[in-house]
Amino acid sequence: MILIRYCFYLEITMSASLSVAKLTFFIAILAAVGQATQTMYVPSIGYMAQEFLVSPAALQAVMACYLIPYGLSQFVYGTLSDRIGRKPIIIAGLAIYIIGSLIALFAHQYSWFLVGSFVQGLGIGCGGAMSRTLSRDCFDGAELHKVNSLISMCLIFSPLVAPVLGGYLTESFGWRSSYLFLSLFAIAVVITMMTSMVETLPAAARKKEPVLRSYHYVLSDRRFQGYLICLVATFAGLAVFEAAAGVLLGGVLGLPATTVSLLFVLPIPGYLAGAWLSNVIARHWREKTAMRIGLLAILTGSLVIMLPGLLGLTTAWSLIGGATIYFLGAGILFPAATTGALSPFPYHAGTGGAILGGMQNLGAGLATLFAAMFPASDQLPLGIIMLLMSVLALWGLKRVYTKQPPSDEMPIAI
């Protein structure tokens, strides 16, 4: 028994010793695959619509077909990773993603392209779950919040820089070149993970309890529920913007692909500032203060987008300006809420990360599917949906900070 405990201690120490820089690099390239897939095709919407003989608005369904399996698959990846480790899950998921990318690359019918997008989401769900889990394996407390803020700053680049690269590739080589790039990038990432990544969950720390018991244990915490609602709603607002803005900027305003891709980059400073502020505010004041400021920002950004829509207007400045403010708030909320949600679960990090990642992407997929039902003639539907998501995030945070009855307290971990 003493020998087992000593080996367990050594393995935990090895995991904790993984440097912040190296951990951030692994998480960044893993998450970048999935996030780049989500937005790289946006500047190509017009070209894809012409080739597949569908309307540009119909291509909003691509993001829904990608995000829904992306979210659902994380429920499987997370609990499996608590049992067999993180590395095997990452490698298997990336292999499935590569197959989906190749299907999308060679698809000549819209239905097959949607199948490819579905398989992509099914595979890269491993990245969504593990990007939240790896940091919890190695850090906790204030250090975990700091690491999550740093990771958030790195992760925002891929979904917003990807359209710039996608626009360039589309103009130079055609829209299919974006999916060739994604396939090659995923192959490079899986090789890196196989050769350089060390397992962050030691064998002695792996949970063998039934899946439903793991989910019940995590979801029984009222604060986790509130953080989850906040994260799902905030991310859904981001996803709806990413899906609709390309249609509005390219389809309604008639801007060229390169201009649309450059406009997508402009909200980046807002998110970076938010992720930096989240760490500063949490360190000098309280987590609650960071959450309030982030919530105020996403509400304000939603209103900036919605108000011109009430007048039947669609303008680039209100879309990008409102998105920048919304991204600022999201940058503050994401690391703070993720840290608050996962901190109580050191032995259920995979399950907790899977729930957060899975529900965020499932919620985003359903929100974009809902948004696709409305005509994309102006920015009013986008503004209304983003405002509704902000109000839902407010309700989630209210649940976090409302004291729960003693009977609802989270059970003691075994």
Language-model-detected regions and their locations in the chain:
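Juxtamembrane intracellular "pre-TM" segments in multi-pass secondary transporters
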Residues: 15-16, 198-228
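Paired small-residue
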Residues: 96, 100-103, 111-119, 317-323
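Helix-loop-helix hairpin linking two adjacent transmembrane segments in secondary transporters
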Residues: 112, 141-142, 149-195
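Helix-breaking motifs and short loop linkers at transmembrane-helix boundaries and internal kinks
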Residues: 53, 85, 106-112, 123, ...
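Conserved MFS/SLC helix-loop-helix module at the cytosolic interface between two early adjacent transmembrane helices
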Residues: 72-111
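Extracytoplasmic
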Residues: 22-56, 77, 241-246
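A late C-terminal transmembrane helix in Major Facilitator Superfamily
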Residues: 340-376, 385-386
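Cytoplasmic helix-loop-helix junction between adjacent transmembrane helices
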Residues: 116-157
